[in-house]
């Protein structure tokens, strides 16, 4: 083959080429030598001398394709009932033949057509050199275009009607020719696949659109039939079956771009159009916890934009009712434990249900959280919410030495689970106050199971609420280890004195930061330290003043405890007592009988505290009341009980200081209210300092938003705090509007 341009007889060359392309397009056998010769002929025509013949070749090829497709169209029409089969057969043959022709015409495609082809800009803005209505196309594209114009479009109505009928028969249980249906539908895609813009437009317009309409009508009627013959449970199962079948059908016949559209149409007709029916049954299904029906309903409703909210609300209501049922009427004796375990049981039950039945959907998890938040924070009318106090007591019970038969690991597991319930509390500041008081008692009276568990719990609270929430708890915990170090230093201080100092007692001290501990520094009574303790107190004050300048020690005698040996009985006993009880008992060192007046003089306690202390000793029968009167008065006298006995050689005399009294609970709640007022005032000042000017409602919303992590403030409390800050001249009402506040710099 010569590459040099030469004179070519077009008619002679075209006749040879025509014979070959007829064979190619009908998939007849063509010898390799013939193929190569025709390839050379096309090259020769494109580079012919004196004038290239590429344009004429293109025109003649186009005429051939038009005639060939018209001929095939006529034969398809003659096939009557076999239109789909014949169309499919000719399409399979023609589309492959067109691919081979495109290869044969490769030189024409690359050297003539591409160089003269209109660009996107030419098509958009116009170009004078080429007929805009008949743009040049590569031969493969031209063949497909001829098929679309001369075969598909004239047969469109017949083809679509037959395709829809065949697919309807498939839905009815018949078994149509899958290969033919898929092939015909795919031809609508294939004829425009060469287009860069909207290659599926033709397929969507002539087939997809009418198919979706027909699908909607079919499933509208199908849903109506199913509703008449089924209850809700059966209806949902049948609908899911229909959807699954339709999905398989889509994959058998349609282009992938249609899958979701078809399923969406089915869902609209069988689910969205009957939401009222499904929602009406939702209540009973959830209340009876029919897991299979819940799973089916979830799958159906999830696919519809307005489907799930009703189901979510129904589950939230159900969890709320279950939670209230589980946490009401709990026995007073073990209420904290029962309350927490009941909430955890409900939480665990519904977490499992949501994960296994509802696919772990976060919308339902949020509903669970909302429901349990309302359960945990539930309060009877005109009463306070008990949850913060109950949860603090639950922790207290777990962290005390008295926690029955539990290892540290078991306590750790329970405290980890407890955080689940804790996160639902609105009034976390109330919990913090109660927890701090109970922690103080555990630490001061040595009641903690272990300091590691105490630290672990504080860290869990820190993770849940942040550093600020636990800062005081951390300081309380730290004070205990600092105090242990101070005791060692104090003992070394005593040993290193120039003169030998004998304190006469074993002495241990806790130095606590006043700002961190929830302890009152104003004692309930005056008190004179017993002589036996004076030296220890004086030496520690000396030691402390030498080591720390500018710090003031305040002795909290009402919290101190000690051990007293009872040497006057046949059996050696050790009593663990408060300092007040110790002061009364030590008075009997000098005399077996002591009057009330003498005790008052030696201890300097007021009447109420002294009487309470004496009664605690009378209750355990360590001393006797020598008066015939039952009540203690100024004339009473007391004597040691020389016949005292106890099952234990070491025993503890409990006092009201170690028990939670109603007054103490009330004080805790009052302290919470005061703290809230200060917190809100600080929040208002922070916000106004940043914003300078703010309207009333906007300020209220920002304060609520900032406070929500600790508690839910009432609007009335916020308003009172605003008024207080106006009085204190931190903020002022704007002169322009009474509904606006300005920050006072």
From Swiss-Prot:
SUPFAM superfamilies: Cullin homology domain (SSF75632), Cullin repeat-like (SSF74788), Winged helix' DNA-binding domain (SSF46785). The modification N6-acetyllysine is found at residue 393. It is found in: Nucleus. Pathway: Protein modification; protein ubiquitination. Keywords: Acetylation, Host-virus interaction, Isopeptide bond, Nucleus, Phosphoprotein, Ubl conjugation, Ubl conjugation pathway. GO terms for cellular component: Cul2-RING ubiquitin ligase complex; cytosol; nucleolus; nucleoplasm; SCF ubiquitin ligase complex. Belongs to the cullin family. This is Cullin-2. The lineage of its organism: Eukaryota, Metazoa, Chordata, Craniata, Vertebrata.
């Amino acid at each position: 083959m010569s590459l040099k341009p030469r004179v070519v007889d077009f008619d002679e060359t075209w006749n040879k080429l025509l014979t070959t392309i007829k064979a190619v397009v009908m998939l007849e056998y063509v010898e390799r030598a013939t193929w190569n010769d025709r390839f050379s002929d096309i090259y020769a025509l494109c580079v012919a001398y004196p004038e290239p013949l590429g344009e004429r070749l293109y025109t003649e090829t186009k005429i051939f394709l038009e005639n060939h497709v018209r001929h095939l169209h006529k034969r398809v029409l003659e096939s009557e009932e076999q239109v789909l089969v014949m169309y499919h057969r000719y399409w399979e043959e023609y589309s492959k033949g067109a691919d081979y022709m495109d290869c044969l015409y490769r030189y024409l495609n690359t050297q003539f057509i591409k160089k003269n082809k209109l660009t996107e800009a030419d098509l958009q803005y116009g170009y004078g050199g080429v007929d805009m209505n008949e743009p040049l196309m590569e031969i493969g594209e031209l063949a497909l275009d001829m098929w679309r114009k001369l075969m598909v479009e004239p047969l469109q109505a017949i083809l679509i009607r037959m395709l829809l009928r065949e697919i309807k028969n498939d839905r009815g249980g018949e078994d149509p020719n899958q290969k033919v249906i898929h092939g015909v539908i795919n031809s609508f895609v294939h004829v425009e696949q060469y287009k860069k813009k909207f290659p599926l437009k033709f397929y969507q317009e002539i087939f997809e659109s009418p198919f979706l309409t027909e699908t909607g009508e079919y499933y509208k009627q199908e849903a109506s039939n199913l509703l008449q013959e089924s209850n809700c449970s059966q209806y949902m199962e049948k609908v899911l079956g229909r959807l699954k079948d339709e999905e398989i059908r889509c994959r058998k016949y349609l282009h992938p771009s249609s899958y979701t559209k078809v399923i969406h149409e089915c869902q609209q007709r069988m689910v969205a159009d009957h939401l009222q029916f499904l929602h009406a049954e939702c209540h009973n299904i959830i209340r009876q916890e029919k897991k299979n029906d819940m799973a089916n309903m979830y799958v159906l409703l999830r696919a519809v934009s307005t489907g799930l909210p009703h189901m979510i609300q129904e589950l939230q209501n159900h969890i709320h009712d279950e939670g209230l049922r589980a946490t009401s009427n709990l026995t007073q004796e073990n209420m904290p434990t029962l309350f927490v375990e009941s909430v955890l049981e409900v939480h665990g039950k519904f977490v499992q249900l949501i994960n296994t039945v509802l696919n772990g959907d976060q919308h339902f998890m949020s509903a669970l959280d909302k429901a349990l938040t309302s359960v945990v924070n539930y309060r009877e009318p005109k009463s306070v919410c008990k949850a913060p106090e109950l949860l603090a007591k639950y922790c207290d019970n777990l962290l005390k030495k008295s926690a029955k038969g539990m290892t540290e690991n078991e306590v750790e597991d329970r405290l980890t689970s407890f955080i689940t319930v804790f996160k639902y509390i609105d009034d976390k500041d109330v919990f913090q106050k109660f927890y701090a008081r109970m922690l103080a008692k555990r630490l001061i009276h040595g009641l903690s199971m272990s300091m590691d568990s105490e630290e672990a719990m504080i860290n869990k609270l820190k993770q849940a609420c942040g550093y600020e929430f636990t800062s005081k708890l951390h300081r309380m915990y730290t004070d205990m280890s600092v105090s242990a170090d101070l005791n060692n230093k104090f003992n070394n201080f005593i040993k290193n004195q120039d003169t030998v100092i004998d304190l006469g007692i074993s002495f241990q001290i806790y130095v606590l930061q006043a700002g961190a501990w929830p302890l009152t520094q104003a004692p309930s009574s005056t008190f004179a330290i017993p002589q036996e303790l004076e030296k220890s107190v004086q030496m520690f004050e000396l030691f402390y003043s030498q080591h720390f300048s500018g710090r003031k020690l305040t002795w909290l005698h009402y919290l101190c405890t000690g051990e007293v040996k009872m040497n006057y009985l046949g059996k050696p006993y050790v009593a663990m007592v408060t300092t007040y009880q110790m002061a009364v008992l030590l008075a009997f060192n000098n005399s077996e009988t002591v009057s009330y007046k003498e005790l008052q003089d030696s201890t300097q306690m007021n009447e109420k505290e002294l009487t309470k202390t004496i009664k605690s000793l009378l209750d355990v029968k360590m001393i006797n009341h020598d008066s015939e009167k039952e009540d203690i008065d100024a004339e009473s006298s007391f004597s040691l009980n020389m016949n005292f006995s106890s099952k234990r050689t070491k025993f503890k005399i409990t006092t009201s200081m170690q028990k939670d009294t109603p007054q103490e609970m009330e004080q805790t709640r009052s302290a919470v209210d005061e703290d809230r007022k200060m917190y809100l005032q600080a929040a208002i000042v922070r916000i106004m300092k940043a914003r300078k000017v703010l309207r009333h409602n906007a300020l209220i919303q920002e304060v609520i938003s900032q406070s929500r992590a600790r508690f839910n403030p009432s609007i009335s409390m916020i308003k009172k705090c605003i008024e207080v800050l106006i009085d204190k001249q931190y903020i002022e009402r704007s002169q322009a509007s009474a509904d606006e506040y300005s920050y006072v710099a």
